[in-house]
Amino acid sequence: MTLLSCITALTLSAVMIYSPLKLLSDVLLKQAEIEEDILLNQNMNRAMELLMRAIREAGYRSNQNSKNENDIQIKQGGLFRGSDAIELMQDLPKHLAYDCMGNILSKERTRHRKTYQHFYLERSRNDPRSAILICQSLDRQGRLHQAELLNQVQYLQIHWVNPHAVDINSMKPKVASGLIKISLGVERKSQAGKGNTLIEQVRLVAPRHI
């Protein structure tokens, strides 16, 4: 067998072996990305549910003399990539209820007889191109403490919307009544070097007591 024949045979063998290996590698990478997408969506769902629960209960009054005009405060922009923040307060409920960290709301966890929860973004220390969704609440001494709810966040947008609008994209900010629109974006980093993927969720929630 000539040298040229040997080189040709080796080349053909390499091509035949490389193609299945490349295909298998691509399949495994795609499977890993799908699994990460599922996990990110689950984590986003959990964070959204905690935020929506706090919004639904905000403004609760234990008696008619209690005021709740300022129990929902949305802060527009000024945070990571212009993201919004929301502060939520309510009188201590008579039924069993929890804050965003899973603590039972109690008299000790109030300030001026109101519970407090705050959702906002904080730039990640490990990856300055992304942020962490933070939840603040009150501990048993009525002091602020916080927990991280979600990583790899790109934006959080919150505003009052027109409850009569049909198309979500056409909804306009309004005064404190009706519905609140929450938009959350999380980035999944590509393992194949083909660019990152933005995963987005939008929810509408109606406060029950405002």
Language-model region placement:
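Short, flexible loop/turn elements at secondary-structure junctions
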Residues: 7-9, 92, 157-162
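Short linear sequence signals and composition-biased patches located at protein termini or domain-edge surfaces
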Residues: 39, 77-79, 143-210
